[in-house]
Protein backbone atom coordinates (compact mmCIF):
# COMPACT_ATOMS: atom_id res chain seq x y z
CA UNK A 1 0.00 0.00 0.00
CA UNK A 2 1.38 3.42 -0.99
CA UNK A 3 2.33 5.70 1.88
CA UNK A 4 0.14 8.79 2.19
CA UNK A 5 1.68 11.98 0.87
CA UNK A 6 2.29 14.64 3.51
CA UNK A 7 1.38 18.18 2.52
CA UNK A 8 2.68 21.17 4.46
CA UNK A 9 1.44 24.74 4.05
CA UNK A 10 4.35 27.13 4.60
CA UNK A 11 3.99 30.81 5.54
CA UNK A 12 6.88 33.31 5.52
CA UNK A 13 6.79 36.96 6.65
CA UNK A 14 10.09 37.55 8.46
CA UNK A 15 11.21 40.65 6.56
CA UNK A 16 9.89 42.23 3.34
CA UNK A 17 8.52 39.24 1.44
CA UNK A 18 5.06 37.85 2.10
CA UNK A 19 4.99 34.25 0.94
CA UNK A 20 3.00 31.03 1.06
CA UNK A 21 3.71 27.60 -0.38
CA UNK A 22 2.43 24.04 -0.42
CA UNK A 23 5.09 21.31 -0.30
CA UNK A 24 4.61 17.55 -0.62
CA UNK A 25 6.86 15.16 1.32
CA UNK A 26 9.35 17.85 2.26
CA UNK A 27 10.80 18.42 -1.20
CA UNK A 28 8.19 18.73 -3.97
CA UNK A 29 6.97 22.29 -4.60
CA UNK A 30 3.27 22.26 -5.46
CA UNK A 31 3.02 26.04 -5.28
CA UNK A 32 5.15 28.98 -4.20
CA UNK A 33 3.69 32.49 -4.16
CA UNK A 34 5.69 35.57 -3.13
CA UNK A 35 4.73 39.23 -2.79
CA UNK A 36 7.86 41.38 -2.58
CA UNK A 37 8.03 44.84 -1.03
CA UNK A 38 11.42 45.78 -2.49
CA UNK A 39 10.07 48.65 -4.60
CA UNK A 40 8.32 50.15 -1.56
CA UNK A 41 11.49 50.15 0.54
CA UNK A 42 13.89 51.43 -2.14
CA UNK A 43 13.37 55.07 -1.17
CA UNK A 44 14.49 54.24 2.38
CA UNK A 45 17.63 52.43 1.20
CA UNK A 46 16.59 49.42 3.25
CA UNK A 47 13.62 47.77 4.91
CA UNK A 48 11.38 50.14 6.92
CA UNK A 49 9.92 47.84 9.63
CA UNK A 50 6.56 49.57 10.22
CA UNK A 51 5.82 49.71 6.50
CA UNK A 52 6.83 46.06 6.11
CA UNK A 53 4.38 44.84 8.76
CA UNK A 54 1.51 46.89 7.31
CA UNK A 55 2.14 45.46 3.85
CA UNK A 56 2.21 41.91 5.25
CA UNK A 57 -1.25 42.48 6.76
CA UNK A 58 -2.60 43.51 3.34
CA UNK A 59 -0.98 40.71 1.36
CA UNK A 60 -0.84 37.61 3.51
CA UNK A 61 -4.34 36.13 3.27
CA UNK A 62 -4.65 36.55 -0.53
CA UNK A 63 -1.16 35.04 -0.91
CA UNK A 64 -2.16 31.97 1.11
CA UNK A 65 -5.37 31.58 -0.90
CA UNK A 66 -3.38 31.77 -4.13
CA UNK A 67 -0.84 29.18 -2.92
CA UNK A 68 -3.63 26.73 -2.07
CA UNK A 69 -5.34 27.39 -5.40
CA UNK A 70 -2.14 26.87 -7.41
CA UNK A 71 -1.56 23.59 -5.56
CA UNK A 72 -5.14 22.52 -6.37
CA UNK A 73 -5.78 21.88 -2.71
CA UNK A 74 -7.53 23.28 0.35
CA UNK A 75 -6.83 23.45 4.07
CA UNK A 76 -8.75 20.18 4.46
CA UNK A 77 -6.00 18.40 2.48
CA UNK A 78 -3.13 19.97 4.44
CA UNK A 79 -1.41 17.92 7.16
CA UNK A 80 0.28 20.79 9.04
CA UNK A 81 1.07 24.49 8.86
CA UNK A 82 4.69 25.66 9.11
CA UNK A 83 5.36 29.34 9.74
CA UNK A 84 8.51 31.37 10.27
CA UNK A 85 8.92 31.99 14.00
CA UNK A 86 12.22 33.86 13.74
CA UNK A 87 14.69 35.35 13.32
CA UNK A 88 13.40 38.49 11.63
CA UNK A 89 11.51 41.72 12.24
CA UNK A 90 9.15 41.30 15.19
CA UNK A 91 6.25 43.17 13.59
CA UNK A 92 6.55 41.18 10.38
CA UNK A 93 6.90 37.79 12.10
CA UNK A 94 3.77 38.40 14.18
CA UNK A 95 1.62 38.88 11.08
CA UNK A 96 2.51 35.48 9.66
CA UNK A 97 2.43 33.68 13.01
CA UNK A 98 -0.97 35.04 14.01
CA UNK A 99 -2.64 34.10 10.74
CA UNK A 100 -1.00 30.66 10.82
CA UNK A 101 -2.39 30.13 14.33
CA UNK A 102 -5.87 31.22 13.24
CA UNK A 103 -5.84 28.83 10.29
CA UNK A 104 -4.49 25.98 12.42
CA UNK A 105 -7.22 26.56 14.99
CA UNK A 106 -9.98 26.82 12.39
CA UNK A 107 -8.90 23.71 10.47
CA UNK A 108 -7.71 21.76 13.53
CA UNK A 109 -4.20 21.39 12.11
CA UNK A 110 -0.82 21.03 13.86
CA UNK A 111 1.40 24.10 13.71
CA UNK A 112 5.19 24.27 13.51
CA UNK A 113 7.29 27.37 14.19
CA UNK A 114 10.30 27.14 11.87
CA UNK A 115 13.66 28.87 12.16
CA UNK A 116 14.12 31.03 9.06
CA UNK A 117 17.79 30.03 8.76
CA UNK A 118 17.08 26.31 8.74
CA UNK A 119 14.53 27.05 6.04
CA UNK A 120 17.33 28.37 3.85
CA UNK A 121 19.23 25.10 4.35
CA UNK A 122 16.23 23.02 3.31
CA UNK A 123 15.71 25.15 0.20
CA UNK A 124 18.68 23.31 -1.32
CA UNK A 125 16.70 20.06 -1.73
CA UNK A 126 13.42 21.43 -3.08
CA UNK A 127 12.26 20.93 -6.65
CA UNK A 128 9.06 21.88 -8.53
CA UNK A 129 6.40 19.25 -9.17
CA UNK A 130 6.97 17.53 -12.50
CA UNK A 131 10.70 18.27 -12.71
CA UNK A 132 13.74 16.09 -12.08
CA UNK A 133 14.20 15.45 -8.34
CA UNK A 134 17.21 17.07 -6.73
CA UNK A 135 19.65 14.70 -4.95
CA UNK A 136 18.84 13.67 -1.39
CA UNK A 137 20.99 15.28 1.32
CA UNK A 138 24.11 13.49 2.51
CA UNK A 139 25.32 14.06 6.03
CA UNK A 140 27.46 15.39 7.53
CA UNK A 141 27.40 18.65 5.60
CA UNK A 142 28.48 22.25 6.00
CA UNK A 143 25.99 25.00 5.19
CA UNK A 144 27.04 28.56 4.38
CA UNK A 145 24.06 30.84 5.05
CA UNK A 146 24.58 34.31 3.63
CA UNK A 147 21.94 37.03 3.53
CA UNK A 148 21.28 40.64 4.43
CA UNK A 149 21.06 39.85 8.12
CA UNK A 150 23.15 36.73 8.55
CA UNK A 151 26.46 35.14 7.61
CA UNK A 152 26.61 31.75 9.32
CA UNK A 153 28.66 28.59 8.91
CA UNK A 154 26.68 25.58 10.14
CA UNK A 155 27.68 21.94 10.59
CA UNK A 156 24.73 19.60 10.12
CA UNK A 157 25.16 15.94 11.07
CA UNK A 158 21.57 14.83 10.49
CA UNK A 159 18.15 16.36 9.90
CA UNK A 160 17.32 19.17 12.34
CA UNK A 161 20.67 18.92 14.17
CA UNK A 162 22.79 22.05 13.82
CA UNK A 163 26.13 23.18 15.20
CA UNK A 164 27.03 26.80 14.57
CA UNK A 165 30.71 26.87 13.67
CA UNK A 166 30.94 30.61 13.16
CA UNK A 167 29.29 33.77 11.96
CA UNK A 168 29.94 37.38 11.21
CA UNK A 169 31.57 39.51 13.89
CA UNK A 170 30.16 42.70 12.38
CA UNK A 171 28.36 43.21 9.06
CA UNK A 172 26.61 40.29 7.40
CA UNK A 173 27.69 39.71 3.80
CA UNK A 174 24.42 41.02 2.39
CA UNK A 175 24.61 44.06 4.65
CA UNK A 176 28.11 44.79 3.34
CA UNK A 177 26.80 44.58 -0.24
CA UNK A 178 24.05 47.09 0.61
CA UNK A 179 26.45 49.52 2.32
CA UNK A 180 29.04 49.40 -0.47
CA UNK A 181 26.29 49.84 -3.06
CA UNK A 182 25.27 53.05 -1.28
CA UNK A 183 28.90 54.23 -1.31
CA UNK A 184 28.99 53.65 -5.06
CA UNK A 185 25.56 55.31 -5.44
CA UNK A 186 24.02 52.11 -6.78
CA UNK A 187 20.35 51.30 -6.15
CA UNK A 188 18.91 49.11 -3.38
CA UNK A 189 19.11 46.17 -2.94
CA UNK A 190 22.88 46.19 -3.10
CA UNK A 191 23.53 42.57 -4.03
CA UNK A 192 22.03 42.61 -7.53
CA UNK A 193 23.33 46.16 -8.14
CA UNK A 194 26.92 45.25 -7.24
CA UNK A 195 26.75 42.12 -9.39
CA UNK A 196 25.42 44.08 -12.37
CA UNK A 197 28.05 46.81 -11.99
CA UNK A 198 30.83 44.23 -11.56
CA UNK A 199 30.07 42.56 -14.89
CA UNK A 200 32.45 44.67 -16.93
CA UNK A 201 34.88 45.37 -14.11
CA UNK A 202 38.33 44.07 -13.20
CA UNK A 203 38.22 42.08 -9.93
CA UNK A 204 41.96 42.67 -9.49
CA UNK A 205 41.82 46.45 -10.02
CA UNK A 206 41.80 47.13 -6.27
CA UNK A 207 43.48 44.86 -3.74
CA UNK A 208 40.86 45.09 -1.03
CA UNK A 209 41.63 43.25 2.24
CA UNK A 210 40.38 39.74 2.99
CA UNK A 211 39.87 39.27 6.74
CA UNK A 212 41.22 35.74 7.07
CA UNK A 213 40.64 35.30 10.80
CA UNK A 214 42.77 32.46 12.17
CA UNK A 215 41.68 29.78 14.67
CA UNK A 216 38.02 30.66 14.16
CA UNK A 217 35.23 30.05 11.67
CA UNK A 218 33.97 33.62 12.05
CA UNK A 219 33.77 36.24 9.31
CA UNK A 220 34.44 39.97 9.33
CA UNK A 221 33.51 42.42 6.59
CA UNK A 222 33.83 45.78 8.37
CA UNK A 223 37.49 46.20 7.34
CA UNK A 224 36.63 45.50 3.72
CA UNK A 225 33.76 47.98 3.81
CA UNK A 226 36.05 50.62 5.36
CA UNK A 227 38.71 49.98 2.69
CA UNK A 228 36.15 50.61 -0.06
CA UNK A 229 35.02 53.80 1.72
CA UNK A 230 38.59 55.13 1.98
CA UNK A 231 39.30 54.29 -1.65
CA UNK A 232 36.16 56.14 -2.76
CA UNK A 233 37.03 59.14 -0.59
CA UNK A 234 40.61 59.25 -1.94
CA UNK A 235 39.39 59.12 -5.54
CA UNK A 236 36.87 61.90 -4.90
CA UNK A 237 39.49 64.07 -3.19
CA UNK A 238 41.74 63.77 -6.22
CA UNK A 239 38.76 64.64 -8.46
CA UNK A 240 38.93 61.34 -10.29
CA UNK A 241 35.88 59.72 -11.78
CA UNK A 242 34.91 56.67 -9.74
CA UNK A 243 35.65 53.44 -11.64
CA UNK A 244 32.36 51.94 -10.44
CA UNK A 245 32.73 48.68 -12.36
CA UNK A 246 36.23 47.99 -11.06
CA UNK A 247 35.30 48.94 -7.49
CA UNK A 248 32.24 46.68 -7.58
CA UNK A 249 34.15 43.77 -9.12
CA UNK A 250 37.03 44.08 -6.64
CA UNK A 251 34.69 44.25 -3.65
CA UNK A 252 32.66 41.29 -4.90
CA UNK A 253 35.84 39.25 -5.41
CA UNK A 254 37.00 39.97 -1.86
CA UNK A 255 33.67 38.87 -0.33
CA UNK A 256 33.62 35.74 -2.49
CA UNK A 257 37.18 34.79 -1.51
CA UNK A 258 36.47 35.09 2.21
CA UNK A 259 33.23 33.09 2.09
CA UNK A 260 34.61 30.43 -0.23
CA UNK A 261 37.94 29.87 1.55
CA UNK A 262 36.41 29.63 5.03
CA UNK A 263 33.66 27.25 3.90
CA UNK A 264 36.04 24.91 2.05
CA UNK A 265 38.38 24.88 5.06
CA UNK A 266 35.48 23.92 7.36
CA UNK A 267 34.35 21.21 4.93
CA UNK A 268 37.85 19.72 4.95
CA UNK A 269 38.20 19.96 8.73
CA UNK A 270 34.91 18.15 9.43
CA UNK A 271 35.18 15.64 6.56
CA UNK A 272 31.75 16.48 5.19
CA UNK A 273 30.07 14.87 2.20
CA UNK A 274 28.58 18.03 0.75
CA UNK A 275 28.30 21.79 1.04
CA UNK A 276 25.15 23.90 0.92
CA UNK A 277 25.28 27.59 0.02
CA UNK A 278 21.98 29.35 0.69
CA UNK A 279 20.38 32.69 1.52
CA UNK A 280 19.93 35.83 -0.55
CA UNK A 281 23.64 36.32 -1.26
CA UNK A 282 23.85 32.79 -2.69
CA UNK A 283 22.16 34.26 -5.78
CA UNK A 284 25.43 36.08 -6.53
CA UNK A 285 26.96 34.63 -9.70
CA UNK A 286 30.59 35.06 -8.61
CA UNK A 287 29.93 33.14 -5.39
CA UNK A 288 28.00 30.40 -7.19
CA UNK A 289 30.74 30.06 -9.81
CA UNK A 290 33.45 29.80 -7.14
CA UNK A 291 31.77 26.87 -5.41
CA UNK A 292 30.76 25.13 -8.62
CA UNK A 293 34.28 25.38 -10.05
CA UNK A 294 35.79 23.25 -7.26
CA UNK A 295 35.62 19.47 -7.46
CA UNK A 296 36.42 18.42 -3.90
CA UNK A 297 32.87 18.54 -2.56
CA UNK A 298 29.38 18.13 -3.93
CA UNK A 299 27.67 21.50 -3.69
CA UNK A 300 23.96 22.29 -3.43
CA UNK A 301 22.93 25.86 -4.26
CA UNK A 302 19.20 26.57 -4.62
CA UNK A 303 17.89 27.99 -7.89
CA UNK A 304 17.77 31.80 -7.89
CA UNK A 305 14.03 31.76 -7.15
CA UNK A 306 14.67 29.97 -3.85
CA UNK A 307 17.71 31.98 -2.71
CA UNK A 308 15.69 34.93 -1.46
CA UNK A 309 13.02 34.56 1.22
CA UNK A 310 10.20 32.19 0.30
CA UNK A 311 7.68 29.94 2.01
CA UNK A 312 8.63 26.74 0.19
CA UNK A 313 11.76 26.50 2.32
CA UNK A 314 9.72 26.99 5.50
CA UNK A 315 7.33 24.21 4.49
CA UNK A 316 10.30 22.02 3.53
CA UNK A 317 11.91 22.37 6.95
CA UNK A 318 8.49 22.09 8.59
CA UNK A 319 7.97 18.67 7.02
CA UNK A 320 10.95 17.21 8.90
CA UNK A 321 9.75 18.72 12.18
CA UNK A 322 6.33 17.19 11.50
CA UNK A 323 7.90 13.78 10.85
CA UNK A 324 9.82 14.08 14.13
CA UNK A 325 6.69 15.26 16.01
CA UNK A 326 8.33 18.62 16.79
CA UNK A 327 5.05 20.51 16.97
CA UNK A 328 4.14 23.77 18.69
CA UNK A 329 1.03 24.85 20.54
CA UNK A 330 -0.93 27.96 19.63
CA UNK A 331 0.61 30.00 22.45
CA UNK A 332 4.13 30.19 20.98
CA UNK A 333 5.76 33.59 20.62
CA UNK A 334 7.82 34.82 17.69
CA UNK A 335 11.59 34.99 18.29
CA UNK A 336 13.18 37.91 16.38
CA UNK A 337 16.72 36.92 17.48
CA UNK A 338 16.36 33.12 17.37
CA UNK A 339 19.76 31.45 16.77
CA UNK A 340 19.90 28.30 14.65
CA UNK A 341 22.02 26.25 17.04
CA UNK A 342 19.04 25.54 19.28
CA UNK A 343 19.34 21.81 18.54
CA UNK A 344 22.79 20.22 18.59
Residue ranges: model-predicted function:
Residues 74-85, 270-281, 300-303:
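Short glycine-rich phosphate-binding loop at a beta-alpha junction
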Residues 157-202, 225-226, 230-233:
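Glycine-rich phosphate-binding loop plus the immediately following alpha-helix
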Residues 195-275, 284-292, 297, 322-325, ...:
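A contiguous, well-structured pocket-lining segment that forms one wall/lid of small-molecule binding clefts
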Residues 5-77, 83-87, 116:
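N-terminal beta-alpha supersecondary unit
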Residues 120, 302-342:
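Glycine-rich phosphate-binding/hydrolytic loop that grips phosphoryl groups
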Residues 1-4, 114-141, 317:
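Conserved phosphate-binding catalytic cores of ATP/NTP-utilizing and phosphoryl-transfer enzymes
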